[in-house]
Design a protein with these regions (language model features):
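Juxtamembrane boundary at the C-terminal end of a transmembrane helix
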Residues: 156-164
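Hydrophobic alpha-helical transmembrane segments
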Residues: 18, 33-38, 53-60, 86, ...
């Protein structure tokens, strides 16, 4: 009998708990969207409590940790970048949240939507890296690139003076 990749992970395992976004990656359909939403909520709270400088340091640490978490969980599941692994979405949306001018609901929604748009669309070179890099770093880097695209759009919106 073949077991599902999800049968090989447990939320009691702290590595799996984090890689699966505290369980948000187990929600169907669209686990990446649910993971991004959970990351947006957590990231907004952390940014509000910690301030930008500490939040950026935490985000960088989460990226480094994520390379391990995602690789270990993918290995345990026997599947590279299984949809339920959403720590990469957390880090991606953290990066975008760090770029918004205020933690107002409109800007938070814009950050979430732009990140999901670029994470799903995967414009060049995101898709290339997503397909070619088979490691924890590879799982993480496509979401960082999607975040960079979203940040570029946010910078443009700020330059043109979007009132939020």
């Amino acid at each position: 009998m073949n077991s599902s990749p999800l049968d090989r992970v447990s939320l009691k395992n702290p590595v799996h708990l984090l890689a699966l976004g505290f369980g948000s990656g187990l929600i169907r359909p669209a686990p990446g969207t649910w993971g991004s939403l959970a990351g947006t909520i957590l990231g907004s709270a952390l940014l509000a409590c910690l301030g930008l400088k500490i939040f950026l340091i935490l985000t960088a640490l989460c990226f480094v940790l994520g390379c391990y978490l995602c690789q270990k969980t993918a290995d345990d599941m026997g599947v590279h970048d299984h949809g339920s692994i959403v720590w990469d979405e957390f880090v991606g949306v953290f990066i975008v949240l760090a770029s918004i001018p205020t933690l107002s609901l409109p800007w938070i929604i814009i950050a979430f939507v732009l990140f999901r748009f670029f994470d799903i669309l995967k414009p060049y070179p995101i898709r290339y890296f997503d397909q070619k890099l088979e490691s924890g770093f590879g799982i993480m880097v496509d979401d960082v690139l999607a975040a960079i695209y979203a940040v570029i759009v946010i910078v443009i919106l700020r330059i043109v003076g979007l009132p939020c």
